[in-house]
Amino acid sequence: MLVFVTVGSTRFDALVDAALSEPVLSTLRDLGYGQLILQRGNSVIESERFNEESCTIQRHGVDIETWKFKPSIQAECEQADLIISHAGSGTILDVLRLGKPLIVVPNPTLLDNHQEELASALQILGHLKATSIQDLASTIASFEPRDIIPFPPFDGSKFSKLVDEEMGFI
């Protein structure tokens, strides 16, 4: 099985370090995830080899492919059995619309902690699981994708109706 981890375009060294840590990789391996793809953006990793544009290694029984950026992460999201992500709104909505199991880790270093608010709201609605860097391994271990409530499909007619009502067309 495949796990895709993405930090987006903002540096999130702590999530990259956690994803490559022994506790997280061992937990993933024990749950049957043998492959991890890591989009690390501009994050800095201690191992110099990881700081190349892309590389592939094996660590703690998990095959790891890592790279900085691609024009689109759609293919990786579609292939993944589990997605672990920063809590950016664009990434969250893209993943939820695909119906993929999603664990989000808000980046606490960002201004006004807006990622935490979004992650918390969507977790309360049951659409994803939110966690911290410190609890990532235990969250993965206890995560039950079948308990996730599917995100409702986009319905553009609601917005159109609202505009029509406000404009007095209806």
Regions found by a protein language model. Name each.
Residues 143-170:
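C-terminal amphipathic helix plus adjacent low-complexity
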Residues 76-79, 138-143, 166:
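CheY-like receiver
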Residues 1-79:
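Donor-nucleotide binding loops and adjacent catalytic segments primarily
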Residues 73-112:
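A donor-sugar binding/catalytic signature common to diverse glycosyltransferases
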Residues 107-130:
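Active-site-proximal loop->helix
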Residues 65-68, 128-139:
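Short acidic-hydrophobic, aromatic-tinged amphipathic segments that line or gate anion-handling sites
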Residues 99-102, 121, 142-145:
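Acidic/polar active-site rim loop that often engages polyanionic ligands
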